[in-house]
């Protein structure tokens, strides 16, 4: 009997511990039905509600990003080449334009910046991923998070996904309204071959690394561009928008044989979860419901499973 009670206790404890570590929202990736984005179109209000703009406080928009939680933004590491000082940055949440006068938008201060340790601060580097911790939590009415994929999510070439951002609509002109663009995922080896054609100066070097993902068109004409960096590449998976890529780099914009290159998000899901778990809740004076349940039920479980232990 005692052995059975111990087994029950350990099982319940394991369940609660797992729940305690599940920080990402259970509801995500929902928007209105559905592209710098070259060859794209204006997005509609509420269509990509996780899209945010990363601002340098004095200069305005520099990169895109995506809300994955009420205090967490996913973006690219190269967006922080100027400084890793959180006080340099704000995040604009809500709205379709970069105007601070737009209704339902707000500018939020940044508390912390976490850049992946493998990023080399060089063009086309692996590890081009970063997490931004907001200084204050967003209210439920202010945000809808994008879903994150499982680490083993298959990314099938030919799958049509969407990239969004305020970057250039040509190689020079910035967009005033959030742009959206449908792009097919590409096979990594095919993408590698494309970057070694048409007079590439990178011949002999491996360009597309295992943590990178290509999307776009062989003929060019449609692509993400400067100012879109850090923004999301999302696919519809199980009827929810799931972020599979982060706009990372490319050569020019919408050029033939030069598709956009994105950080492959499934590669970094474990890192994202670890950073969130290590820097969650206590600093804001609140606790997750799972954590509260854990604290309330643990004494009860001990009393039931281990009589006389309390």
Curated annotation (Swiss-Prot):
Which keywords has UniProt assigned to this entry?
Answer: Cell membrane, Disulfide bond, Glycoprotein, GPI-anchor, Hydrolase, Ion transport, Lipoprotein, Membrane, Protease, Serine protease, Signal, Sodium, Sodium transport, Transport, Zymogen
State the annotated membrane topology for this chain: Lipid-anchor; GPI-anchor
- Activity control mechanisms: Inhibited by aprotinin, leupeptin, benzamidine and soybean trypsin inhibitor. Partially inhibited by PMSF and DFP.
What is any one GO biological process for this UniProt entry?
Answer: sodium ion transport
Enzyme class label: hydrolase
Asked if the keyword Disulfide bond belongs to this entry, the reply reads yes
Which cysteines bridge via disulfide bonds?
63-79, 161-235, 191-214, 225-253
Q: Which residues are glycosylated?
A: 238, 279
GO-annotated molecular function = serine-type endopeptidase activity; serine-type peptidase activity; sodium channel regulator activity
Q: What residues does the Peptidase S1 domain cover? A: 37-277
Active site location: 78 (charge relay system), 128 (charge relay system), 229 (charge relay system)
InterPro entries registered for this protein in UniProt: Peptidase_S1_PA, Peptidase_S1_PA_chymotrypsin, Peptidase_S1A, Trypsin_dom, TRYPSIN_HIS, TRYPSIN_SER
Described by its record, this protein's role is as follows: Selectively cleaves synthetic peptide substrates of trypsin. Activates the epithelial sodium channel ENaC.
Protein name, as recorded: Serine protease 30
Upper classification of the organism? Eukaryota, Metazoa, Chordata, Craniata, Vertebrata
């Amino acid at each position: 009997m005692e052995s059975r009670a111990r087994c029950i206790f350990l099982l319940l404890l394991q369940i609660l511990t797992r729940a305690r570590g599940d920080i990402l929202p259970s509801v995500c990736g929902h928007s209105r039905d559905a592209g710098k984005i070259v060859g794209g179109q204006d997005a509609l209000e509420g269509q990509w509600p996780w899209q945010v703009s990363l601002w340098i406080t004095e200069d305005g928009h520099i990169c895109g990003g995506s809300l994955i939680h009420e205090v967490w933004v996913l973006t690219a590491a190269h967006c922080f080449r100027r400084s890793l000082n959180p006080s340099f940055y704000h995040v604009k949440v809500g709205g379709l334009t970069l105007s601070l006068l737009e209704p339902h938008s707000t500018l939020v201060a940044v508390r912390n910046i976490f850049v992946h340790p493998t990023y080399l601060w060089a063009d086309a580097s692996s590890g081009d991923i970063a997490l931004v911790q907001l200084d204050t939590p967003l209210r439920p009415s202010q945000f809808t998070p994008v879903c994150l994929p499982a680490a083993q999510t298959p990314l099938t070439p030919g799958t049509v996904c969407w990239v969004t951002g305020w970057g250039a609509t040509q190689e020079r002109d910035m967009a005033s309204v959030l742009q959206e663009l449908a792009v097919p995922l590409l096979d990594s080896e095919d993408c590698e071959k494309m970057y070694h054609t048409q007079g590439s100066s990178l011949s002999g070097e491996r360009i597309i690394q295992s943590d990178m993902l290509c999307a776009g068109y062989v003929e060019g004409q449609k692509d993400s561009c400067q100012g879109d960096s850090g923004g999301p590449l999302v696919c519809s998976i199980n009827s929810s928008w799931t972020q599979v890529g982060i706009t990372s780099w490319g050569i020019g914009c919408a050029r033939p044989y030069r598709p956009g290159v994105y950080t492959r998000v499934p590669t970094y899901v474990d890192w994202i979860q670890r950073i969130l778990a290590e820097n969650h809740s206590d600093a804001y004076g609140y606790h997750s419901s799972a954590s509260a349940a854990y604290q309330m039920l643990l004494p009860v479980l001990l009393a039931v499973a281990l009589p006389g232990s309390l």
